[in-house]
Amino acid sequence: MNEGEQLHLDQLFEKLLKARKIFKNKEVLRHSYTPKDLPHRHEQIETLAQILVPVLKGETPSNIFVYGKTGTGKTVTVKFVTEELKKVSHKYNIPVDVIYINCEIVDTHYRVLANIVNHFKHETGIEVPLVGWPTDEVYAKLKQVIDMRERFVIIVLDEIDKLVKKSGDEVLYSLTRINTELKRAKVSVIGISNDLKFKEYLDPRVLSSLSEEEVVFPPYDANQLRDILMQRAEEAFYPGVLDDGVIPLCAALAAREHGDARKALDLLRVAGEIAEREGASKVTEKHVWKAQEKIEQDMMEEVIKTLPLQSKVLLYAIVLLDENGELPANTGEVYSVYRDLCEYLDLEPLTQRRISDLINELDMLGIINAKVVSKGRYGRTKEIRLNVTPYKIRNVFRYDYTIQPLLAISLKDSQRRLV
């Protein structure tokens, strides 16, 4: 960078600093933020408090299962109530530890137990590696560290349905029977699930040891979402920077998707960020629509990024057909290119029937459109089109070493390999 470029960059930062500020505290709009009040969740707060109040009397509370779709306030409400419980218990000299575990990340029996042990490492000096020990040994350490003194331990397992679907229900069995093996401490579990049918995945022996109470969180409606956004906006934005239509529009768009407060907060935050980057003095409805487009684009990129390898190869076959002007294509045509690409990668191809299933999955995810059409006496077939531009898909695959080798080849290259 030469001196002129350095000066220009300095001036750019100065200019950006002097621009009218939009955000007073952007963190208020993050999912991780716990507000001082939770509008339209007072009933659920009271129910959780009633279930947990035995702690303050020295009694073990029931285990709790919290249900509701994404963005219905489950996690923030549980965090709010358990934080308040800790404050009150401190006043009464009752030791309470709350351990929050996100089971989308900590997704095995071993890792959940290790996380609980390591929560106490500053107190006990005991730390378990995240892999490598026998699970029974980790469980023994868990009992040892928890039972070092009298206390209540509340273990919050967020997205517990994902843990059970991936790794089974052994962790729940371990934690729900642990109280029979402890002498000083008492343990209670709060499971948070997006899946209302979650308990159908549990073994009868786990169900019998749970003795749980259930709290259901219904979706928010547009008016409730508006109240939530109004409350957060007061702390998040400087006065007068939001146009009157911004919050109602964010609320209405999020209400379409089962009343998702997370989506509403994301829309408001991203709209503010776009306005800030544009140097606008106000956040307008135009910025909300741009935010909606950006969030959908980011979500689609994330979906593509996390596809299994076989689905990525299949998707790239469809990209090549599109770039060659050969869409819509049928399943057989797509399968032919997919098989060539598998050979290029030295990858065992799946059967055409299995690829037909993967095409349906890509269709359900919204990445492609696979419409069944009638060909008269030739029967019915799928017409496959892309819903995402080849450029965007290539851009995601650029950073994926498993699929990268394919990016340099064209449709003709892939077909030539078999000649």
UniProtKB/Swiss-Prot annotation:
Cystine links in this protein are none
Q: Which SMART domains match?
A: AAA, Cdc6_C
Q: Which GO terms describe its molecular function?
A: ATP binding; ATP hydrolysis activity
InterPro entries tied to this protein: AAA+_ATPase (IPR003593), AAA_22 (IPR049945), Cdc6_C (IPR015163), Cdc6_lid (IPR055237), ORC1/CDC6 (IPR050311), Orc1/Cdc6_arc (IPR014277), P-loop_NTPase (IPR027417), WH-like_DNA-bd_sf (IPR036388)
Q: Key word Nucleotide-binding present in the record?
A: yes
Source domain of life? Archaea
Arranged from A to Z, the UniProt key words for this protein are: ATP-binding, DNA replication, Nucleotide-binding
Q: Which Pfam families match?
A: AAA_22, Cdc6_C, Cdc6_lid
Report residues binding ATP: 72-76, 220, 232
- Could you mention a single GO BP entry for this protein? DNA replication
Report the function annotation for this chain: Involved in regulation of DNA replication.
**Family under the similarity heading:** Belongs to the CDC6/cdc18 family.
Q: What is this protein called?
A: ORC1-type DNA replication protein
Q: What is the lineage of its organism?
A: Archaea, Methanobacteriati, Methanobacteriota, Thermococci, Thermococcales
